[in-house]
Amino acid sequence: MAGHSKFKNIMHRKGRADAARSKLFSKLSREITVAAKTGMPDPAMNPRLRLAVQNAKAESMPKDNIDRAIKKAQGGDAETYEEIRYEGFGPGGVGVIVEALTDNRNRAAANVRSIFTKNGGNLGETNSVAFMWDRVGQIVYGPEAGSEDKVMEAAIEAGADDVESDEDGHTIWTAYDALNEVAQALEAALGAAKATRIAWRPKAMTPVSGDAAATLMKLIEALEDEDDVQNVYSNADISAEELEKLAS
């Protein structure tokens, strides 16, 4: 459940799609601005910016928004964002990693801590959770990319480490330093990915169900709704039956 695709599908079924899309565009814009500010403003010469722009396009973000986010980085009045990682535990002992981009460290920390506390979790110290995870490349395709066998064959050919497929699509995992190379090979074979990023992958999953699963969903939803938060990862293992029950 590291990418929370099933969580997101449930949230969208609950009628949150429009608000979630607006929030998503805001987060994508922030990543583009930070990427452009930390390197060259040309995606062809800035790998991080290239990935940020690709991810924005995959989410159908308008070109004007993308260009505006890049130009914002070149302005003298552009905000200075700090990248911060928070780690904690949710209901059922589930590990949670939160990545933030913020222009106010104190505000972000207070808000993230409050969200954990209000939703059955607790914020931990640095590396209280991350030591149980690997930092890897993650490439996500929808089910339209092809069958599990087709994607697996393309991933092996591209040099990927692992593939996970389900009804929501395909997640391809790569070594940290092989992401760009594998992503380019997969694009040639399968077309543009829905998302390409450096991500956290848990070494072991934590089963969770019932009330703990319901509260965990609220925790992750609240974290993802927080303006300063860019990505949320958990090692929750929730069965498909449990997720459908929670969605009803």
Curated annotation (Swiss-Prot):
Subcellular location, record wording: Cytoplasm
PANTHER family in alphabetical order: TRANSCRIPTIONAL REGULATORY PROTEIN YEBC-RELATED, TRANSLATIONAL ACTIVATOR OF CYTOCHROME C OXIDASE 1
Keywords of this entry: Cytoplasm, DNA-binding, Transcription, Transcription regulation
UniProt-recorded Gene Ontology molecular function terms: DNA binding
InterPro entries noted in UniProt: Integrase-like_N, TACO1_YebC-like_2nd/3rd_dom, TACO1_YebC_N, Transcrip_reg_TACO1-like, Transcrip_reg_TACO1-like_dom3, YebC-like
Family of the protein in this entry: Belongs to the TACO1 family.
HAMAP family linked to this entry: Transcrip_reg_TACO1
GO biological process, one term: regulation of DNA-templated transcription
Keyword Cytoplasm: yes
Annotated Gene3D superfamilies: 1.10.10.200, 3.30.70.980
Protein name: Probable transcriptional regulatory protein PHZ_c3068
GO cellular component: cytosol
The UniProt record lists the keyword Magnesium: no
Protein origin, superkingdom: Bacteria
NCBIfam families linked: PRK00110.1, PRK12378.1, YebC/PmpR family DNA-binding transcriptional regulator
